[in-house]
Amino acid sequence: MPDIRCIAVVGTGAMGTGIAQIAAQAGLTVWLFDSRAEAAAEARQRLRQTFESLCGKGKLSAADAEAAQNRLRVAERLEQLGDCELVVEAIVERLEAKQELLRRLEAIVAPESILASNTSSLSITAIAAACERPQRVAGFHFFNPVPLMRVVEVVDGLASAPEVGDALLALAARLGHRGVRTKDSPGFIVNHAGRAYGTEALRILGEGVAECAEIDRVLRECAGFRMGPFELLDLTGLDVSHPVMESIYQQYYQEPRYRPHPLTRQLLAAGRLGRKSGQGFYRYVDGQPQDKPGPQPVPQAAIRPPVWLGCENEDDRRTLAELLHRLGVEPETGERPSAAALCLLAAWGEDLSSAVQRFACPAERSVGIDLLCDLERRRCLMLSPLTTPAMRDAAHALLAGDGAGVTVLRDSPGFVVQRVLAMIVNLACDIAQQGIASVEDIDQAVHLGLGYPHGPLEWGDRLGPRRLLSILQRLQTLTGDPRYRPSPWLRRRAQLGISLRAGETAAVG
């Protein structure tokens, strides 16, 4: 492949302009073209202001800012792009439009030049099918804002030559981005892996387990996400998020793991798109949330009962006993709870009603606790339909005794954190099982592209593959929903006691 020194960006919206910025800063000559005659010139002027701003903030020297600006060229006709070694299209997400553009470019650029699409939702194979030389077409999918989101998906279509992807990976490194390589499949890596977070949170909300503000709070404070799922949906806008959910679900022929929720369709129909419309899951004024519910208040408990622990293993018992000790309580040590005891049950992948049966405890005096949470920041409790208000308040007040937050949920298999994290890890395992990308690229793409605290496979190793397998199996049993069926990748590695990042042995030496 030719050394890439000169590129063109076709389509000068936010994405195209961002790609042009990082390319010019990396020393490449960049041609800008847009079907709207003045748009490319306007993009060049915006980039001049961007470079001046970076210079003013000390992030770019005056000489580098001027050099980057001088590398930008405006093309009035596609024919002016003939000397480019790479053309990146960032035009409207319509298959026919992209196919027509690439057909025209094929007749202009050199035979060895690369044609790349920044599509986020269309098939690279389908785009390339309109070309005489589909082997030189690949995906080069950036994320907004391009200069800050330092990951780019390099997508191999069915006909893409391997050296084309190799060249794009090398270019990504020159641009200061982490290139991740993926097969052409719905959602590629990032939009595919991202289906678990929002859809499972919507399911939890739809089941009445908790309100959206409490679900957001739990996932931020207990699991370490930067934003809760409903905050994120409001930020992105349901006019963007819901069609992506629908698209990937349909492209995978109604695979239950990707199933959207009717609630987002209803909000979309009502025009409640999120921040941009002033109302979504929350209400906004000038982009700022209004009347957002605060944490659940700590009750004044009428009783302070003794505490008996129901745990599946000694590690769980030790974790709970140490927590109670810090709160000034020593748990009962008998095999059965005393007549007045609060039964605190560490449930995994099941609802409290099921845990009560398994531990043979009185449901009226039982409360579940999620040990997958960060217990230093927030404790997540669960009630059964029979838990008395007195025991609910006693458990809440006790576990809030050191100032940590407490969230009380209605009965639900897997609380909130267990369900969401198990689905995220399981979906990443399925991506690995399908051979869409390497385990390293899956983790890097999700960590950098979605901002999760860890890559999903690394996260699964931290949580424990066997524990996650058990959670998913119980969720599937209790709900009967095939969306929770464990990926073979996860099941096999849990059974063998190995890392989720362990690859497959080749069938042929």
Spans of model-derived segments:
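Rossmann-like NAD(P)-binding element
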Residues: 39-42, 53-115, 122, 325, ...
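A short helix-to-beta-strand connector/capping loop
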Residues: 60-73, 135-136, 177, 364, ...
